[in-house]
Structure formats: C-alpha cells, structure tokens
Amino acid sequence: MRVVIAQCSVDYVGRLDAHLPMADRLILIKADGSVSIHADDRAYKPLNWMTPPCTFEESAIEDIDGEDTGEKLWLVENPKGEQLRITIAQIHQEIDMDLGEDPGLVKDGVEAHLQELLAEHIETLGEKYSLVRREYPTAIGPVDIMAKNSKNEFVAVEVKRRGGIDGVEQLTRYLELLNRDDLLAPVHGVFAAQEIKPQARTLAEDRGIRCVVLDYQELRGIESNELRLF
C-alpha cells in the first residue's frame, strides 16, 4: 500500500473526459494495482479511481525547453485504454508499506458464533433438548453440535450461516457414520442456519433431516419472534 498526500491535478481520459484542478488530495495505490484519489470529504468515496488490472508509470514533466519542471506525471491505464493522468506538483507526505494478506472482516453472526449461541440455547431445537458437546469428534471430522432430544436420543446438528446442499451432504455423511455405532444409534439430524436454500431444504427433508431457521438476534437474547422451526 502506497499512501501519498500531494498537491495534484487529475485528468481522466476515456469514455468521458473529467478534470480535477490542482489541490491537496490523498492518493492510494494498492498492491492489487488499484489507484484512487480522495478529498477531505465524501467519506470513503473517491473523487476518481482506476480498478485493476491496470499499469502504473511515473515520469518527469519537462517544459518546452526540455527542462525538468519538478512536477511528476503518474499515468495509470487499464486494458481498455482509459487513463488517469495525475500531475504531482508537490508531495507533502508519503508512506509505502506492505500490509500483507488481510484476514478479512469478522462479522457478528458467522458460523462459529452461531454454533456457540445455539449450544448455549440448545432448547431452541426443542423442549428438553440437552447439549452433549460442541465439535463432537468423528473419524471424518467434528460434528458442530451433538445433543440429545426429549427421548434421550442423540441428535447431530450442522450449523451454517447460509445453508446449502454441501452442508446437507456433510451432515448426511456424519449421520451415516454415527448410526453405525450401536451405542449412539439412532442418531437424528438437524440442519440449522440463518438461511436455508430451497434445494438444500428439499434434500434434507428427503433424507429425514430436520431444518431449523435460526434467528441470530433471538439467540443473542434480543427480543424477536422470527425463529421458525420446520
């Protein structure tokens, strides 16, 4: 990431020409090749930008006599031939730093948190449900939640934020394995998610797996009536 605060003017040459007159601005040049120009307003929105892939060239600007004016031209061009022509009159501050790979945004409500909340409120799945343990180990990987129902029978629970066919297939494999163990069988299946895709619901119900749509806010103890059991 290259962060530059500079006095500059910007010309966009492409489908429509646009010009930003000389002023102090923030210029961001990211490792992915994108370039954006910002003013001290407009929140996060840039005044102008170029998305990757694009090329970046820097050259000195000379006057008509071939003398160096002290200004720099930054030329950013994409494969379509569109250009950002940034004229740098003066650089006030500049930082060039490798930020490395970003871990991404950790959102409130991802699967790990849903699993934790559902384990804490296991009665969401039905009256007299009890928690056996989270991350119940099997030979093919851990089951998100192992619980017992009102009949004291084991229930394997797969927790997803968005439930698709892959999640149903995964739970099916767990159930097939667990039901081979006479000490556990019969083991029932619950597919729990904030959102369950129609194809996944159809497949789950065809295999005798119960679907539970989770209300994240209700699990957090916030008043809501949106929890639906199917």
Curated annotation (Swiss-Prot):
One GO molecular function term of this record is: single-stranded DNA endodeoxyribonuclease activity
The subcellular location is:
Cytoplasm
Q: Does the keyword Hydrolase apply?
A: yes
Q: Which domain of life is it from?
A: Bacteria
* Keyword hit for DNA damage: no
What are the protein's UniProt keywords?
A: Cytoplasm, DNA-binding, Endonuclease, Hydrolase, Nuclease
Q: Which InterPro entries match?
A: Endonuclease_NucS, NucS_C, NucS_N, NucS_N_sf, Restrct_endonuc-II-like, tRNA_endonuc-like_dom_sf
Instruction: Cite the EC number.
Output: 3.1.-.-
Write down any Gene Ontology CC term.
Answer: cytoplasm
Question: What S-S linkages are listed for this chain?
Answer: none
Similarity comment text for this entry: Belongs to the NucS endonuclease family.
The record's function comment reads: Cleaves both 3' and 5' ssDNA extremities of branched DNA structures.
HAMAP family for this protein = NucS (MF_00722)
Q: What is this protein called?
A: Endonuclease NucS
Q: Which organism is it from?
A: Corynebacterium aurimucosum (strain ATCC 700975 / DSM 44827 / CIP 107346 / CN-1)
